[in-house]
């Protein structure tokens, strides 16, 4: 362990942040479509809100935040990976609901699990993966 690391008090990944142009639209997508729960919704200055959503029973949240001043919202590869027990069923359900998903589930084979990408209404990409049992 490095000299710096031994002095730190880090304990978990608490939240990740995606920028969104319309907070209510993002809440509708993450809560209404993906099944997250809204766990934080608080004013952030006179015109903005800080919102966090999480999957039921999980400690890590996704913050749905406005972009920094002068920057656009969304359009990023978030690096967020959501685990599922049935990647094919989730892909079919999201595609049928009109969510922007890849045309097919990607299957690389070997130790790489099946997966597909989806994009939220702001173009932020998330990956849904079915880990090996």
Where do the language-model regions lie?
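Short amphipathic alpha-helices within nucleic acid-binding modules
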Residues: 29, 88-93
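Vicinal oxygen chelate
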Residues: 1-9, 15-18, 41-42, 49, ...
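Short, P/G- and charge-enriched loop/turn segments at secondary-structure junctions
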Residues: 4, 39, 67-70
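Residue-level recognition of conserved beta-strand positions in structured domain cores
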Residues: 55, 64-66, 130
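Helix-adjacent hinge/juxtasegments
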Residues: 66, 73-74, 80-84
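Short, charged/polar surface micro-motifs in flexible loops or helix N-caps
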Residues: 56-61, 69-71, 87-89
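Helix N-cap motif at beta-to-alpha junctions
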Residues: 22-23, 84-88
């Amino acid at each position: 362990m490095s000299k710096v690391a031994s002095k730190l008090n880090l304990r978990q990944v608490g939240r990740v942040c995606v920028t969104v142009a319309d907070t209510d639209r993002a809440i509708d997508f993450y809560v209404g479509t993906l099944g997250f729960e809204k766990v934080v919704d608080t004013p952030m200055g006179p015109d903005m809100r800080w919102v966090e959503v999480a999957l039921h029973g999980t400690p890590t949240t996704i913050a749905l935040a406005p972009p920094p001043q002068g920057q656009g919202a969304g359009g990023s590869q978030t690096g967020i990976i959501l685990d599922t027990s049935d990647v094919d069923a989730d892909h079919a359900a999201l595609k049928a609901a009109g969510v922007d998903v890849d045309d097919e589930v990607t299957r690389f084979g070997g130790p790489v699990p099946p997966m597909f990408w989806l994009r939220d209404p702001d173009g932020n990409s998330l990956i849904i993966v079915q880990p090996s049992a």
